[in-house]
């Protein structure tokens, strides 16, 4: 018996300025991170088939909070603050980076990190920093090269191979795929990846259900 995750049922739970204001550190969380213009909100909306689950800001750098969404019992998606926007004051940038690093290094229920980057400008310094933090904490990483529809097929494949080669040098579990919120490219693969990361929480749910059924 298996549980199918219905990502369209995902709903907003809470926002927090840092790890100390998040709910209890339990279940499984999968975090989404990316530069302010990487298309993170659009990717989350496409993943869940909801137009406004994650608010797409006209002004990059506005999302300063950690946003928590419930997918199903024991399974959560975390939308981390966008980083790397030039017009944000340095003090605020440093605060965000500290908050991001703290979350990636100390949150016990974090079991997967999705790093989104524009396929035309991949693997900037902060993107690589996020991946290094995850690897240090033994968290698997899924890199999504977003806005893949902006490149023709040949250029898209070449960029994918280049980033995959770079990802091999990180030394951790880092997978790289292309993604297009507009065309739906890579959406099914992303759902399949999240399914595997969420699987342990769903297994606990099944055990609890079977236990309560046998008790009856």
Curated annotation (Swiss-Prot):
Organism domain of life: Bacteria
Annotated residues for binding of Mg(2+): 41, 63
A single BP term in Gene Ontology: division septum assembly
Positions bound to GTP: 34-41, 61-65, 79-82, 146-149, 179-181
SUPFAM superfamilies: P-loop containing nucleoside triphosphate hydrolases
Domain EngB-type G residue range list: 26-200
Function, as annotated: Necessary for normal cell division and for the maintenance of normal septation.
The protein's name in its UniProt record: Probable GTP-binding protein EngB
Record lineage: Bacteria, Pseudomonadati, Pseudomonadota, Gammaproteobacteria, Vibrionales
Gene: engB
